[in-house]
């Protein structure tokens, strides 16, 4: 009878150990996969992310927003001319070079306005290039191999049946946290891209104010916002890369209970920091 009990206990222990290791290895595989997927999502330019949506945004911008921006630019140019004349002793000191200067500034403003989409795409091309370069470094340094679970398996074999059962239930809970993490990442990444499209659609209006010293703050802040949301992708990738390194430390720690709850804590921390990336990026570039 004792032999049968020992055999049944060993069988249950091996079954639970396989289940725990399977759940944890699935977690680590998910982490590796998410780093690669996020690198692809946040490193994609608006034109490449969804060509149909980008074409729609561009058409709306050029047919609806651009005429309004033309009126704004006309107002800015006239205001600039009047201000320039008044500043010269109320029209008493007028030089012909002033008009050449005004013509040059207006021509430059028209050129910039007519190439608004090229400027916007160039900004996102720069951020995409930086993200693509960083993705190779981050993903290459955070890969979690199955060999890292060997020490953890040895620790599990020394534990009792009750402890293993508790760990198995906890490891299932980890799967739900990863599902929640995937939802958060999906909302953040896709929400960021929709924000980019909305910013892009209204681009001509703030760009039309760039030539004026007093009103140019609108256009300057708009460009800062573009850089901020572009490089937010790098911060998102960096957060996931740090998370992967922390999870890697859990995998090699050899403490199964710590691995379970450490993963939960790191997942909650990652979700919090992902929502902070936008604020951090805007503070870096001075956008508001």
Annotate each predicted stretch with a short phrase:
Residues 54-66, 97, 101-104, 157, ...:
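Alpha-helical membrane-interface segments at transmembrane helix boundaries
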Residues 207-224, 251-253, 282-286:
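Alpha-helical transmembrane segments
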Residues 1, 8, 12-23, 95-112, ...:
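Alpha-helical transmembrane segments and their helix-start/interface "positive-inside/aromatic belt" motifs
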Residues 1-72:
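Binding/recognition "hotspot" determinant
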Residues 72-108, 202-216:
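Hydrophobic transmembrane alpha-helix segments characteristic of membrane transport
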Residues 16, 20, 106-202, 236, ...:
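Non-cytosolic segments of integral membrane proteins
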Residues 33-65, 85, 89, 109, ...:
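Internal transmembrane helix-loop-helix hairpins in multi-pass membrane proteins, together
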